[in-house]
Amino acid sequence: MGKFTGKLIISDLDGTLIPRGGVISEENRRAIAYFVGEGGLFSVATGRTPEAAAGYVEGLPLNAPGIFFNGAMLYDWQRKQVLKTLPLTAGDENNLWPAFAREALRRFPEACLEVYAEDNCHVVTPEANDDPRLPYEYYRYAHTDLERLTDTGKTPWLKFFACDRHEHLERYVALAEEMGVAALANGFYSEDNYYEFVAKDVSKGAMLETVREMLPGVEIIACGDYLNDRELLAAADISVAPATAHPAIRAAAKLKGPAVEEHLLVWLIDRL
């Protein structure tokens, strides 16, 4: 029995554990290693794929299931095994998602649109529209003709992602409502210029309830900074937000920590 036995810390990555454009600090790494060494459980909850997260979290003692695709996948780090997926396109009997994607391609010529499947990130817009982050990510992606992805029974979509100017995304969301796909999904801003759709009842917080069922009796401490972390923090026993969090997220958090650049996990673990 260690000091932190019976506790799980599950943290968002970008903006919470990782500064924008940065890496996980050595200070945070040492704090996490100490926490796990004293019996604690640690994992991450992110919009990223496991592959994309791996480049950042390599070397961390991830000893609890991780949440990916903003709640559409639960993944066992130690066994490198997908435990659960909740596809966006499940139940879309009228194939509305491919129809919406076609119309979005037509109406938003500056957008970068990405279809996330279990095996790859498919960019369905021209290379000239690519989100500048793509070459620097730790995962494979391919430029794919949308028509190769319209059989969603064969290739289920886990997430549909748009990068564009915020004012364009407001019209994009209105189009989703007009075409009926918004009613099939949970849609949210993950950054000011990023909008994501996952399946209707999917969120980091909903998947955290599955983690809770797998780890009965464990106290869950969740850290997050942006609107896609709202349900995650609400589902935790203790919620934590950095000083750099979105104002609504920081206001809702039980514990209000320092900025992401000031080693949030060090601050948190010192207080447990």
Give the role of each language-model region:
Residues 2-38:
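N-terminal glycine-/serine-/threonine-rich phosphate-binding loop
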Residues 3-8, 25, 195-272:
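Mg2+-dependent phosphoryl-transfer enzymes with acidic/Ser/Thr/Gly-rich catalytic loops
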Residues 13, 48, 224-226:
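Active-site metal-binding loops of divalent metal-dependent hydrolases
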Residues 23-130:
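Active-site phosphate-binding/coordination module
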Residues 39-43, 62-64, 158-159, 218-220, ...:
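Short active-site oxyanion
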Residues 60-62, 70, 78, 179, ...:
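Short, structured coil segments at secondary-structure junctions
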Residues 90-91, 144-148, 256-260:
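Short acidic-hydrophobic, aromatic-tinged amphipathic segments that line or gate anion-handling sites
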Residues 109-223, 227-232:
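Conserved acidic, metal-coordinating active-site core of Asp-based
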